[in-house]
Amino acid sequence: MKRLQSGLSVLLALLIALPFFPGTTAAAQDTDQNVPDYSGRSDSFARYAAAIADRPAADTTISLNAADAVLSPTLSEKLEGDSAVRVETGGYVEWTFSADKSGVYEIGLSYLASAGKGQKPQITLTFDGSVPYTEASHYELSRVYRDAGPIEKNAKGDDLIPEQVEVERWQDRPLLDTAGLSGRNLCLYLEEGAHTLRLACESESLYVRSLSLFPGTTVSSDAEKAASYQQNGYQSVEGFLKIYQAEKTLEKSDVVLYPTYDRTSPATIPYDPVRIRRNTIGKGNWSEPGMWISYLIDDIPSDGLYYITFKFRQADAIGVTTFRNVYVNGSIPSKAYENVSFPYGVDWNQKTVVDENGEPCPVYLTAGENELLMEVSLGPYVEAMRMVDDSIYELNRLYTQMVMITGTTPDSYRDYELDKEIPGLLDAFREQADALYAAAALFESLGGEEKSQSEDILGMARRLESLIRDPRSIQKRLSSYREGISALSSWLYDRTSQPLEMDYLIVHSAGQELPSPRASFWQQVSHFFKTFFASFLEDYNTVGGSGSEEGITVWANIGRDQIQVIKNLVVDQFTPQTGIDVTLSVVQTGFIEATLAGRGPDVAIGMARGQPVNLACRNALLSFDSYGGFEDMKKRFSDTALVPYQYNGKTYGIPCTQTFFMLFYRKDILSEMGIAIPQTWTDIMETVPKLQRSHMTIGLPYAVISAATAVDNGLGAKDLFATLLLQNGGTFYNEDHSATALDSEASMSAFKTWSDFYTKYGFDLVYDFYTRFSTGEMPIGIASYEMFNTLSVAAQEIRGLWGMAPVPGTIREDGTVDTSEAGAGSAAVIFKKAASPDNCYRFVDWWTSDKTQTDFCTAVENQLGPGGRYATANLAAFSSQPWSPEELEMLTTQRENVIELPEIPGSYYVSRSIDNAFRAVLYDKKNPRETFEKENRNINEEIARKRRELGLDNEGKGR
């Protein structure tokens, strides 16, 4: 009876709510095709490779040349002489061919990435009409970069980062498993007979010369290679040693692989205790599988056998050994050069390439010039990592099934009989426990420092065994079970990051005495005193070093890791280009107080959204409108991005960041339940009872307000009221912004709808979206698109199981869906007291430019990882970030529907009063209309008072 009453209540609530959504009387859209198509991880390349592991390897090569290709009708063309094909975004090239014999073929591509936005070209390979595995879809091809010239110095004597320029040249490369968990190159199993293979270009454009299907390459054992050397008569060269500085590269795969610096050791070459010397390379920038750096090994005196030693430090990934494949003249010489290990250590170390017996392993070099390439790999632990990854997926799937029965807070006095309700649950636990034990055993068999890390895996295996022994305790220990999955996910993510810093590499003969990688005691003492006394003489806050007397002071509301990136950009780009020195400081609050005290900066970047108008109305800021080039500057941003920073018809702030809401959804859960991705608020309401029957819910954004956030954050990103208001055709203020426009019926309807989400449907007001989304308890939620960063990094247990879409909208009379929403962000401003306003404008113009924002976003993300992706307001820089084509399309579509809201003197009272009305309805059961009307009157009284305080003309001066 209670269930019946509950069901009727939900149905009644749904019927009551429908009138509050404009356009819901129109025919409901057919959204069945919008149910996520998700088949688990059965389509991963790791699974594909495992399935064909016992198939015979191919013994011939199939070459598919440009001359034989069939092209898409548009967006692709053959070049003169049929030597290559140019494929634009959206175009494709296709081959029909025959395999004379069944076998496993690896895939190689000869291509040239044409100049574009600088993103990695993405391709999709279709084999006989279908994509064979996930990794063949949106596969990223690397570009090639080099230093534009030698390392130069600024006026202070600090080394500058050399400009990174793209090298447009042909690359002949096998396609690597970018996920890195199969331990091999991408491949296809071909049955004997005719086949079709299509290469589609998903982003950027490229030239394709050929695609080859070839037998898998094998690396010779050290013994085999030694025998080959002996058979060919190669002899060890004597009396040779040369140091090659690691920062002086030949080429590299990514623009972020620029020279870095180390001032912690006087043994680093080159060294200076005070000045910045770009003397190392790598660190966290060089950590993703497939990234590579190449070196020109010149001045080799004669053909023969040489040894290679690296001076390195791996202090970024604590307790982890990282790995590199070393290629010499295009191939890995022997097993010793495959997965060369670099163990963790806080100090500098040396590593000579050794064979399986621990003896130095030689490599054959020719006289003159040779090429050495180092490529990031995951090492010998890749199979164990794949096993852990598979277990994480299965354990997470089982957790979702259990929560659908018990809910998020199980009744501790009830026996849910989960082992009976979920057929095969205990068998699944046993299977995963065995898999984890096997993964741990593999780690232990490899030995070394990695042995201790198997404890992270064993802990979850033991937890599963405990649940098998006592099934009735499962519901009481769900949180512990979930914590175990999260721990495994964190462990796996940490293992896939492979950072390494290098000072130099040495090519030498056997028996040569190598320089010590570490400084002596007296060198360390000297270094300490030199740096200590320099700290009293050097101004480390002022960067640039031009010696200009018209330098500027900039305060940045930004993280300390990010401020270092800005300093690098100022030193390497802004000051050399303009001759203007910059004093940078991290300051997050106190702009008004500092300005009133006469101690404020010349420029502030990252200023909170509500502050520019707050300062402009007090005559504390300069407007940008009178500067030449301002009209072009505005084109860098979306149409309404400058609206929050305009006052009395002038612009006082330039957008730095811009954020907005997106809808996040779990592909696996929605697919299993047959639920479509909600496109309208009607869809949301129809989805609620389906989820609630399985103890799940939907998350809507709401931020608790405070005095500070009311001023700083503005109106757009606090909750859904602004979104609903805009979709209903409403607005916050009248034309001259002297009063609100919240007395309209659109405003009342939006407020009522927003309140009903919580009063009628019981949506949670405050919750941890990341955690509940990861666990599956909240498979649909609306949050800032920055949540993408968090989920990409921290929620490895649901990697590939979630997606992102525009926010739900309101159906218009013409049947289209209005997904308008408000936004949030920060700005750059120039203070009126600035001594050199023109220099300040040049800085803001430079800082918000396409190139600077792109360089900044790239550097920050490579330093902090995907979790540090910067929410730039610059459209070109935003598009250059490593989104997939689908992600960028979704974000761009939603961004085009962001309508920024104006800020006015007293607007802090608007967000506070609307929140007061909302909480009165939610907690005190007040009448929505009466409460909203009362607070609206209070808002207008405060706006009028504020205008009188600032001496504004009530009749027409506007804001």
Feature roles, as predicted:
Residues 807-809, 858-916, 920, 948-959:
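Long, aromatic- and glycine/proline-rich binding clefts that accommodate carbohydrate-like moieties
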Residues 532-546, 609-662, 685, 717, ...:
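Hinge/lid segment of periplasmic solute-binding proteins
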Residues 446-459, 470-473, 477, 504-508, ...:
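C-terminal capping/gating helix-and-loop segments adjacent to ligand/active sites or protein-protein/ligand interfaces
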Residues 29-504:
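Extracytoplasmic
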Residues 572-644, 668-679, 776-780, 787, ...:
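Extracytoplasmic "Venus flytrap"/periplasmic binding protein-like
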Residues 616-619, 638-683, 707-737, 751-752, ...:
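Periplasmic solute-binding protein
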Residues 101, 301-302, 795-869, 896-899, ...:
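Extracytoplasmic/periplasmic substrate-recognition and gating elements
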Residues 736-766:
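Glycine-centered hinge/linker elements that transmit conformational signals in sensory
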